[in-house]
Amino acid sequence: MAEETPRYAVVTGANRGIGFEICRQLASEGIRVVLTSRDENRGLEAVETLKKELEISDQSLLFHQLDVADPASITSLAEFVKTQFGKLDILVNNAGIGGIITDAEALRAGAGKEGFKWDEIITETYELTEECIKINYYGPKRMCEAFIPLLKLSDSPRIVNVSSSMGQLKNVLNEWAKGILSDAENLTEERIDQVINQLLNDFKEGTVKEKNWAKFMSAYVVSKASLNGYTRVLAKKHPEFRVNAVCPGFVKTDMNFKTGVLSVEEGASSPVRLALLPHQETPSGCFFSRKQVSEF
């Protein structure tokens, strides 16, 4: 019997947490995975850990350094994948940041308790907002743009954008921004840029609170709402692809100081499912809350 054609995946932000676990689950299914991270030493350590644990070869799991905020770094990775594999089947955009400074002790003490006020334990600034948008929105967008030519060579191209239920439109309180992002028919990359630029402008002018962008974590909410919107735009532009955004649930990770309720194994299983579902059974242009299609 002829050996099955190998399938290739790239996972961003993968040296720990959900990204690391996505790599483990994909590699366990025989997918050849490129694990990427900003920190080279941590990334190489992560690859060695998985190779030992899964008893897989150097060909099955590779490392490449990647900073999604740096276009040159993305180009370098795309060249590497082209040279190594000649195509790509699965792109998982997992890298992300919170865009805030958190009082970790207050979070651990109060998370999940009644009357807990997020806005009292976090600090948001223009610089943090800019970085959050750059990594959470423009990072995945540039990754998609760089890898679309290689994904087109796959017989079942997948893009899985790891998002958050915080990016659902009900959490975008600014009516103008919500109006643009909820108008799926007319949504374009340019219109998403308009929303982002307005948020940055309001941060610069100190009017974010009065413009009522979100209850808290405005940068994170808008970055993920924008990523969800871009998922719809991309799915429409490439009907032969399967492009979806997914909230993995409230997972115990370093980002939330391990205050989540789900394990990383449970969290990673939702993006992995979307990466591996048979092509005909996979919808496109959807937002999933874990394994269920949910509203944007």
UniProtKB/Swiss-Prot annotation:
Q: How does activity depend on pH?
A: Optimum pH is 9.0 for the forward reaction and 8.0 for the reverse reaction.
According to UniProt, the reaction catalysed is: (+)-neomenthol + NADP(+) = (1R,4S)-menthone + NADPH + H(+)
Any one GO MF annotation of this record:
(+)-neomenthol dehydrogenase activity
> Which BP terms from GO are recorded?
defense response
Q: Tell me the keywords, alphabetical order.
A: Cytoplasm, NADP, Oxidoreductase, Plant defense
Q: Quote the subcellular location field of this record.
A: Cytoplasm
Cited function? Aldehyde reductase that catalyzes the reduction of the aldehyde carbonyl groups on saturated and alpha,beta-unsaturated aldehydes with more than 5 carbons. Involved in basal resistance against pathogens.
Q: What is this protein called?
A: (+)-neomenthol dehydrogenase
The organism named in the record is Arabidopsis thaliana (Mouse-ear cress)
